[in-house]
A protein has these predicted regions:
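Bacterial N-terminal signal peptides
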Residues: 8-17
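Terminal, non-catalytic domain-edge segments
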Residues: 29-58, 131-181, 205-215, 226-233, ...
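N-terminal carbohydrate-binding/catalytic regions of secreted carbohydrate-active enzymes
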Residues: 52-127
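Short, solvent-exposed segments of well-ordered alpha helices
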Residues: 62-67, 113-117, 186-197, 276-287
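Acidic/His metal-coordination segments adjacent to aromatic residues that form catalytic metal sites
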Residues: 103-112, 181-188, 252-281
């Protein structure tokens, strides 16, 4: 809920300090239930071994390298949320040790050239980091956050917000881009007006830092306050948001229609000698929009008033409905994703309809905290083991061919158990979204 100082908040903080990060007031449930107030489901001995042999091993590695930085934030986000939801001190401490090493290196020698990474890679990893910071603060253990993280991340992301040009240089700064899009500016290409994944992360990181400052009793910066307001305005704007008849939600419909990646969106499958055939009403591809499932919670939790909080909470619930009823479909016994978030299929990049479903397995959709989504992940978990080939595994990502960590690479990650672990954690998160 919005953070209004009250006696109840003071009591909550006292109780939180008594439960000290690992000893949750409510222990993880051993039953696979999904009531709205159900806690995280505890791992069996076999499941705990899977977690340790995947996430536990990864957290001993320096994952902010050029090879691993992008994938790590995707793959470890939900296992990290599970650790805190379950109140598992051993797992939380493993993440704390990982971020200790990260902070020491990046604020020191920067041995792996993290600071030279591109904007999306760094921001995605920074978002993973600020989520850790917020989870620590919410769980009553802010002392586990390395001291160097806030002074490193905050000025960098504020600079990106205030000084870096928008994508395609449509505006001189990201800040200006937000306001021009809200004002309905007409661009030479429709996709110039997109609020892209970098924009989502910028606002989410700044919102996280604002929540962290509130939780730790320090004053928000002006940019953090502004970022929360922009996030609200983006989700409130009638120009950008469409509520569907079944209670779902679509963001910026049609904005991508003239982008090259969407040039063949009106084909259901890749055909030889295709000519461009775009769709004017095309929506975000579901793979990239999975990031909104996490970012929308960060945006919501930073809101200072009940009105603004309630609007973004409404969008969260609508996005959960959109995923559960339109995006995620049962196809030949598997839960697969439609190409686009309006529930339609088409050709996107190298994928035909339902072929770009690997994003479901990283589990970010589960962060929406919805009963229906948790049930979907419970059913997907029963599909394992899944093979490391396209013929027997409909989630297999055949299009990503860059060098990857063996735990993240589709050729090896299924056999090593990483994909199963991500789905397992997603199936056991609490149904009520974090507030």
């Amino acid at each position: 809920m919005p953070r209004i100082i009250s006696i109840s908040m003071i009591i909550a903080v006292m109780l939180q300090s008594m439960t000290a990060c690992g000893q949750s007031a409510r222990a993880p449930s051993t039953e696979d239930t999904c009531a709205d107030d159900a806690p995280a489901v505890a791992l069996t001995a076999e499941e705990a071994a899977l977690y340790d042999s995947t996430v536990g091993v990864l957290l001993t590695q320096e994952l902010w390298t050029d090879r691993d930085i992008y994938d790590t934030a995707h793959a470890l986000m939900v296992p990290m949320h599970y650790a805190f939801a379950a109140g598992d001190m051993e797992k939380i401490d493993a993440f704390a040790a990982f971020f200790d090493r990260f902070a020491a290196d990046v604020t020191g020698a920067d041995q792996y050239s993290f600071q030279e990474q591109g904007a999306l890679n760094r921001l995605q990893f920074y978002y993973f980091t600020t989520q850790f910071m917020v989870l620590c603060a919410e769980s009553g253990c802010p002392e586990k956050v390395p001291e160097g993280l806030l002074p490193m991340i905050e000025p960098q992301v504020e600079t990106v917000f205030s000084e870096w040009p928008s994508n395609w240089k449509s505006e001189p700064t990201r800040r200006e881009h937000f306001y021009q899009v809200l004002a309905g500016k007409q661009y030479p290409y429709s996709y110039y007006s997109i609020i892209d994944d970098v924009d989502m992360y910028i606002l989410a990181i700044l919102c996280d830092l604002g929540v962290y400052r509130q939780k730790t009793g320090t004053e928000l910066t002006a940019v953090e306050t502004e970022a929360a307001e922009i996030a609200y305005k983006l989700l409130a704007s009638p120009l950008l948001n469409e509520e569907t008849e079944n209670g779902g939600w679509v963001f910026q419909r049609g904005v991508w229609w003239d982008h090259p990646n969407f040039a063949y969106a009106d084909y259901q499958a890749i055909l030889p000698d295709m000519e461009p055939k775009p769709r004017r009403d095309v929506t975000w591809d579901s793979s990239h929009f999975t990031r909104m499932a996490a970012c929308i919670i960060s945006w919501r939790n930073a809101q200072p008033t009940q009105k603004r909080y309630a609007l973004i909470e409404k969008r969260r619930a609508q996005l959960a409905t959109q995923f559960a009823s339109e995006i995620c479909k049962k196809v030949n016994g598997y839960w697969l994703a439609t190409t686009f978030i309006d529930g339609t299929n088409g050709v996107f990049r190298k994928y035909s309809g339902y072929e770009n479903s690997a994003h479901i397995l990283i589990g970010w959709w589960s962060l929406l905290g919805d009963v229906r989504i948790r049930q979907i992940y419970t059913e997907i978990l029963k599909e394992f083991p899944l093979g490391a080939n396209r013929d027997t595994n409909p989630y297999f990502d055949f299009a990503t061919i860059r060098d990857q960590n063996p735990f993240y690479d589709a050729d090896t990650g299924y056999d090593l158990g990483m994909y199963q672990c991500m789905v397992m954690c997603a199936s056991k998160l609490p149904c009520a979204s974090r507030s």
